[in-house]
A protein has these predicted regions:
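Glycoside hydrolase catalytic-domain context in secreted enzymes
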Residues: 1-622, 636-641, 645, 759-760, ...
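Terminal connector regions
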Residues: 617-664
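Charged, amphipathic alpha-helical linkers/stalks
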Residues: 652-724
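Long, acidic serine/threonine- and proline-rich intrinsically disordered regions
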Residues: 661-662, 711-789
Length: 805
């Protein structure tokens, strides 16, 4: 242990106290022992250090900071170096605000386009997500503070996120949902990792020994601190035993007593507590020293410029009929759409940044060299039909050569705590687009959304520019691309399906009960569409440019490829060269092809460069459930190089030496998984893939039933609570402004009451509430009262002792 000299001076109460937060965003300090507190802060796309009363949902004001493009946006750059630059700037701002741990980046796999938090995540592909996240982590930690990649693991939905159980087979777990984290841990060495709220195969992620001990610490060599998501601790003692370091936020002193009792009863050893404490102290002393040395100011103008560059390099040109873009100087334009005046530039929830400044698209156009004939709102942002707004916009469109129509999802359509209902744009926006296209065919749609959308309206626009969520400088970045100041080089980090009905998870997202079946297995995103031969609107890795690129002279070996790429167009630009690995004759079923390498290259007009893309230990491996290890199937592999997953330009074959393990599925009946046709996998086949029966899905009246599920209990008071919360939630959604706090409460398990109320409610009181829900009204009420009195008395005495430490 690095800090044994300090640990041996602490009694058990002091040790246990340090393993829980001291406030909503600060760890506990023991000044008498020389142990300071440190501050943690949200920040996947900017620092969100709260100035006043703290909360974990981003509802209260925070200190102004640069709002960079979201992770979903920067992922479209396919440029880990750009991610590193953004991460370094965020780390600089965090250190200036005396923040020691920046809670990000998020690299959950985009299993479904409807996940409400997809704007915070990089990709449907673990290799791309891992490489981008590693760049962010390296950048953040250059400042001496800690990055905190999240949410570990298999957390791809918002509905019931604190109580849902992700049921996933071991191979899919390893290859798809853990590989990104593996890349981050091994390549960027984050000082912390955040565990997710959900259960994974029956055990909460934060106390899952298989995830935290077997894989994260033993297999990957992680030696940092594991931090719970806020309120994500279920059994604190079991979490400490199995590798979770710090419980956040301040859960009250009852959690300390819970941990002490576990040690005293032999449930866990004091050595487990000491091991976690050593991890925490290393984090505290290491990052505290860096923060104390850091300047208290930063160059906000330089960071704004970086935010604009990052947004511009991440913009994806999805359509450009007749080379309408870039616009010529002096082009007569009309600007339509509410998003032009009030940009949608970030997501809602805990990642929301109080931006230092926010550029307006209308303001940025004044220096573009374009001739703007006017602006019209065109539609109501929340989707309400308004004929007057539409008529005004259509009239204006007739006065311009080109119409710039700013469309997108509003702030509440994509939010922490709430999954999307569909992949559609609001009908009033589509009505406006159709009406404008009828009077002016030169329509450029500028799209703001954090995830993929259905695009049956594509015929009504000549150009489609996807800005995703571009941060505070995203508007200026759009102008840069429209005018040709920047040649678009972004590529989609997720597949855009023709319709949600084509999605491989349409029948299993987000799950109707406690369990969420990952029945599709490996076939997420392009892995499904290409294996099953399903057409899509825009494939993974797709993006147009104002120039063109030629690929030639492919040379391949098992260790990687080299090729020559030439800019054959009329302007300088960047190309993302993508390397996919395929084994058409595979005995062990696998997707048709998988991304295993990429490189972004900048080329002047007529310039050629040799591009090298290495292949690492993840290129050919698969997880063998029989040998419980990574294996390689020997034989011939195709190395496919292209501009997208569907635009393969060059192919070569290499022979790879295998590890000799037999096919683990050779005697298992898995017809749907062998073909990729996984939209209707029967129960028996999914159970065969799991290697165990499918868990029963039912609501249990226990500590982990949600407040919304109290309606299924036997307590009239519980019925009332569930009904009131449900009514408030329904009304807020009908208003077009879902209340994030109500959403969180509705889906919050009862045990979280003991973790999120600053000690006002103890776990004993929660047990009394459970008894109420079970129908033992009088006994339950008495239990709540007795435990409340006990909690107050014990908290007072414990805090007095700790303050005197």
């Amino acid at each position: 242990m690095k800090h044994a000299d300090i640990i041996q001076t602490l009694d058990l109460e002091q040790k246990c106290a340090l393993l829980s937060g001291g406030t909503v965003f600060d760890t506990r300090a023991l000044p008498g022992k020389g142990i300071p507190s440190i501050t943690l802060s949200d920040g996947p796309n900017g620092v969100r250090k709260q100035a006043g009363a703290a909360d974990h949902l981003g509802l209260n004001p925070s200190v102004p900071a640069t709002c960079f493009p979201t992770s979903a946006t920067v992922a479209n750059s396919w440029d880990p170096a750009l991610g590193e630059a953004v991460g370094e700037a965020m780390g600089e701002e965090a250190a200036a605000q005396e923040v020691s741990v920046l809670l990000g980046p998020g690299l959950n796999i985009k299993r479904s386009p409807l996940c409400g938090r997809n704007f915070e995540y990089f990709s449907e592909d673990p290799y791309l997500a891992g490489k981008m996240a590693a760049g962010y982590v390296r950048g953040i930690q250059k400042n001496g503070i800690a990055a905190c990649p999240k949410h570990f693991a298999v957390n791809s939905q918002e509905l019931r996120r604190m109580a849902s159980d992700s049921i996933v087979d071991e191979r899919t777990l390893r290859e798809l949902y853990l590989t990104g984290f593996e890349i981050v841990v091994k390549e960027a060495k984050p000082k912390t990792i955040m565990s997710s709220y959900n259960l994974v195969n029956g055990t909460y992620a934060n106390e899952n020994a298989h995830l935290l001990q077997d894989i994260l610490r033993r297999d990957w060599g992680f030696d940092g601190a594991v931090v719970t998501d806020w309120g994500g601790s279920n059994d604190h003692a079991l979490g400490v035993k199995n590798g979770s370091t710090l419980e956040m936020p301040f859960p009250g002193d009852d959690s300390i007593r819970e941990l002490m009792k576990a040690v005293e009863s032999g449930k866990i050893s004091e050595h487990d507590v000491d091991a976690r404490l050593d991890e925490l102290l290393e984090l505290v002393f290491d990052t505290k020293a860096a923060v104390e040395k850091a300047p208290r100011t930063f160059d906000a103008a330089a960071h704004h410029a970086l935010a604009r560059r990052a947004a511009a390099q991440s913009i994806v040109l999805l359509r450009n009929e007749g080379a309408l873009l870039p616009l010529k100087k002096g082009e007569k334009i009309a600007v339509l759409g509410d998003f032009a005046r009030t940009p949608r530039y970030q997501g809602a929830g805990s990642s929301a940044v109080n931006s230092i400044q926010v550029d307006s698209f209308l303001d940025c156009l004044t220096e573009s060299g374009l001739t703007n004939v006017g602006y019209a709102q065109g539609f109501d942002r929340q989707g309400k039909a308004d004929e007057a707004l539409k008529k005004e916009a259509v009239a204006l469109a007739q006065n311009a050569n080109v119409v710039l129509l700013c469309m997108g999802l509003d702030e509440i359509k994509e939010s922490e705590g709430l999954d999307r209902m569909d992949m559609k744009l609001a009908q009033n926006q589509l009505d406006l687009l159709a009406a404008v296209a009828a009077v002016n065919p030169n329509v450029v749609v500028l799209l703001s959304a954090g995830s993929s959308l259905e695009t049956p309206w594509l015929k009504d626009c000549k150009a489609l520019v996807y800005g995703c969520l571009g941060g505070q400088a995203g508007a200026g970045a759009l102008v840069d691309v429209l005018t040709g100041t920047v040649c678009p080089g972004g590529k989609l980090a997720e597949t855009w399906a023709n319709a949600y009905s084509d999605s491989p998870v349409k029948d299993h997202f987000a799950g109707e009960g406690r369990t969420v079946q990952y029945r599709e297995g490996l076939y997420v995103g392009y892995r499904y569409f290409e294996t099953a031969g399903r057409p899509v609107a825009f494939p993974f890795g797709y993006g147009l440019s104002y120039t063109t690129f030629a690929y030639k002279d492919l040379k391949a070996a098992p260790e990687g490829v080299t090729l020559t790429v030439t800019n054959t167009g009329k302007c300088a630009g960047a190309e993302v060269v993508q390397l996919y690995v395929a084994k058409p004759d595979a005995k062990v079923f696998r997707p048709a092809q998988e991304l295993k390498g990429f490189a972004k290259v900048w080329l002047e007009v007529g310039e050629s460069k040799t591009v090298s893309i290495p292949l690492d230990d993840k290129a050919y491996r698969y997880w063998n459930v029989a040998t419980d290890s990574w294996e390689v199937e020997g034989g011939s592999y195709q190395l496919r190089v292209g501009a997208s997953s569907a635009d393969i330009r060059l192919t070569a074959e290499v022979v790879v030496l295998g590890s000799g393990a037999p096919d683990p599925y050779q005697s298992v009946d898995l017809p749907h998984y062998r073909t990729g046709e996984i939209t209707s996998v029967p129960d028996a086949e999914f159970a065969a893939l799991l290697g165990r029966p499918i868990p029963e899905d039912k609501i249990r009246i226990d500590r982990n039933m949600t407040l919304g599920e109290l309606g299924h209990g036997r307590s009239p008071l519980g019925w009332l609570v569930a009904a009131v919360l449900g009514l408030l939630l329904k009304r807020s959604i009908q208003r077009g402004k879902p209340d994030l706090n109500i959403l969180f409460q509705y889906n919050m398990p009862l045990r979280a009451l003991a973790k999120m109320t600053n000690g006002a409610i103890s776990m004993g009181m929660v047990d009394g509430i459970v008894m109420e829900a079970q129908g033992f009204w009088i006994i339950g009420l008495l239990r709540v009262i007795v435990e409340a009195v006990k909690n107050i008395a014990q908290n007072g005495a414990m805090e007095k002792r700790l303050k005197n430490s």
